Protein backbone atom coordinates (compact mmCIF):
# COMPACT_ATOMS: atom_id res chain seq x y z
CA UNK A 1 0.00 0.00 0.00
CA UNK A 2 1.46 3.35 -0.98
CA UNK A 3 1.35 6.30 1.39
CA UNK A 4 -0.36 8.39 -1.31
CA UNK A 5 -3.33 6.04 -1.33
CA UNK A 6 -3.33 5.29 2.40
CA UNK A 7 -6.69 6.94 2.98
CA UNK A 8 -8.56 4.87 0.43
CA UNK A 9 -7.04 1.71 1.82
CA UNK A 10 -7.30 2.43 5.52
CA UNK A 11 -10.37 4.40 6.51
CA UNK A 12 -14.04 4.60 5.73
CA UNK A 13 -16.03 7.74 6.44
CA UNK A 14 -19.39 6.75 7.89
CA UNK A 15 -20.85 10.25 8.23
CA UNK A 16 -20.32 13.58 6.50
CA UNK A 17 -16.95 14.61 5.10
CA UNK A 18 -14.27 15.43 7.64
CA UNK A 19 -13.89 19.14 8.26
CA UNK A 20 -10.68 20.86 7.34
CA UNK A 21 -8.03 20.95 10.06
CA UNK A 22 -4.53 22.45 10.21
CA UNK A 23 -1.77 20.22 8.81
CA UNK A 24 -0.10 20.10 12.24
CA UNK A 25 -3.25 18.61 13.77
CA UNK A 26 -3.54 16.03 11.02
CA UNK A 27 0.12 15.10 11.45
CA UNK A 28 -0.35 14.82 15.23
CA UNK A 29 -3.36 12.53 14.76
CA UNK A 30 -1.47 10.44 12.20
CA UNK A 31 1.48 9.98 14.54
CA UNK A 32 -0.79 8.95 17.42
CA UNK A 33 -2.66 6.52 15.16
CA UNK A 34 0.59 4.98 13.95
CA UNK A 35 1.78 4.54 17.52
CA UNK A 36 -1.51 2.80 18.39
CA UNK A 37 -1.09 0.45 15.43
CA UNK A 38 2.53 -0.25 16.38
CA UNK A 39 1.31 -1.15 19.89
CA UNK A 40 -1.22 -3.65 18.51
CA UNK A 41 -4.17 -1.45 19.48
CA UNK A 42 -7.50 -2.80 18.26
CA UNK A 43 -10.78 -1.33 17.03
CA UNK A 44 -9.31 2.07 16.16
CA UNK A 45 -11.83 4.83 15.52
CA UNK A 46 -11.40 8.54 14.92
CA UNK A 47 -14.14 11.06 15.67
CA UNK A 48 -13.98 14.57 14.20
CA UNK A 49 -15.33 16.41 17.25
CA UNK A 50 -14.38 19.95 16.23
CA UNK A 51 -17.96 21.08 15.60
CA UNK A 52 -19.57 19.28 18.54
CA UNK A 53 -16.90 19.60 21.25
CA UNK A 54 -14.94 22.72 20.42
CA UNK A 55 -11.89 22.06 22.60
CA UNK A 56 -10.30 19.44 20.35
CA UNK A 57 -10.44 18.47 16.70
CA UNK A 58 -10.18 14.68 16.98
CA UNK A 59 -10.87 11.92 19.47
CA UNK A 60 -8.87 8.79 18.74
CA UNK A 61 -10.43 5.73 20.36
CA UNK A 62 -8.54 2.46 20.69
CA UNK A 63 -8.91 -0.73 22.71
CA UNK A 64 -6.45 -3.08 24.34
CA UNK A 65 -6.96 -6.72 25.26
CA UNK A 66 -6.02 -6.21 28.92
CA UNK A 67 -5.34 -3.38 31.35
CA UNK A 68 -1.58 -3.95 30.90
CA UNK A 69 -1.97 -3.81 27.13
CA UNK A 70 -3.75 -0.46 27.50
CA UNK A 71 -1.01 0.87 29.77
CA UNK A 72 1.71 -0.32 27.38
CA UNK A 73 -0.08 1.23 24.42
CA UNK A 74 -0.42 4.54 26.26
CA UNK A 75 3.25 4.44 27.30
CA UNK A 76 4.29 3.95 23.69
CA UNK A 77 2.09 6.80 22.46
CA UNK A 78 3.37 9.16 25.17
CA UNK A 79 7.03 8.22 24.59
CA UNK A 80 6.70 8.50 20.81
CA UNK A 81 4.93 11.84 20.91
CA UNK A 82 7.28 13.26 23.56
CA UNK A 83 10.25 12.26 21.38
CA UNK A 84 8.59 14.14 18.51
CA UNK A 85 8.30 17.26 20.69
CA UNK A 86 4.59 16.84 21.50
CA UNK A 87 4.27 15.69 25.11
CA UNK A 88 0.73 15.29 26.44
CA UNK A 89 -0.98 18.09 28.30
CA UNK A 90 -2.51 15.60 30.72
CA UNK A 91 -3.13 11.92 31.37
CA UNK A 92 -6.04 10.49 33.38
CA UNK A 93 -6.88 6.91 34.36
CA UNK A 94 -3.48 5.34 33.73
CA UNK A 95 -3.26 3.64 37.12
CA UNK A 96 -6.02 1.08 36.49
CA UNK A 97 -5.65 0.87 32.70
CA UNK A 98 -9.38 0.55 32.07
CA UNK A 99 -9.98 3.94 30.42
CA UNK A 100 -6.97 6.17 29.88
CA UNK A 101 -7.41 9.65 28.46
CA UNK A 102 -4.32 11.31 27.00
CA UNK A 103 -4.81 14.95 26.06
CA UNK A 104 -2.59 16.30 23.29
CA UNK A 105 -4.66 19.46 22.84
CA UNK A 106 -6.18 19.23 19.38
CA UNK A 107 -6.19 15.42 19.59
CA UNK A 108 -7.39 13.40 22.59
CA UNK A 109 -6.63 9.69 22.86
CA UNK A 110 -9.15 7.46 24.65
CA UNK A 111 -7.58 4.05 25.29
CA UNK A 112 -9.94 1.43 26.71
CA UNK A 113 -9.74 -2.09 28.05
CA UNK A 114 -12.16 -3.83 25.62
CA UNK A 115 -15.06 -4.61 28.02
CA UNK A 116 -14.94 -1.13 29.53
CA UNK A 117 -15.25 0.52 26.13
CA UNK A 118 -18.58 -1.23 25.60
CA UNK A 119 -19.88 0.07 28.94
CA UNK A 120 -19.08 3.73 28.26
CA UNK A 121 -19.96 3.67 24.53
CA UNK A 122 -18.05 6.86 23.80
CA UNK A 123 -18.85 6.53 20.10
CA UNK A 124 -22.54 6.60 21.01
CA UNK A 125 -22.08 9.63 23.26
CA UNK A 126 -20.46 11.52 20.38
CA UNK A 127 -22.71 10.11 17.64
CA UNK A 128 -23.11 13.56 16.06
CA UNK A 129 -19.38 13.73 15.30
CA UNK A 130 -18.28 12.50 11.87
CA UNK A 131 -16.68 9.11 12.36
CA UNK A 132 -13.72 7.51 10.63
CA UNK A 133 -13.46 3.74 10.99
CA UNK A 134 -9.86 2.64 10.75
CA UNK A 135 -9.14 -0.74 9.26
CA UNK A 136 -5.90 -1.01 11.26
CA UNK A 137 -3.39 -0.89 8.39
CA UNK A 138 0.28 -1.61 8.69
CA UNK A 139 1.16 2.05 8.14
CA UNK A 140 -0.57 5.42 8.22
CA UNK A 141 0.47 8.58 6.46
CA UNK A 142 -0.15 12.18 7.44
CA UNK A 143 -2.84 12.15 4.76
CA UNK A 144 -4.91 9.47 6.53
CA UNK A 145 -7.32 12.06 7.87
CA UNK A 146 -6.79 14.97 5.49
CA UNK A 147 -8.02 13.48 2.24
CA UNK A 148 -11.40 12.47 3.63
Question: What are these regions, as identified by a protein language model?
Answer:
Residues 1-46, 50-51, 68, 72, ...:
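Long, contiguous binding/interaction regions
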Amino acid sequence: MSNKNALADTIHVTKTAISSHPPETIKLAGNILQSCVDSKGIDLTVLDVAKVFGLSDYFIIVSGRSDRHVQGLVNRVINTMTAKGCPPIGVEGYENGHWVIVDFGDVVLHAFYEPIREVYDIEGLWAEAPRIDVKEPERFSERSLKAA
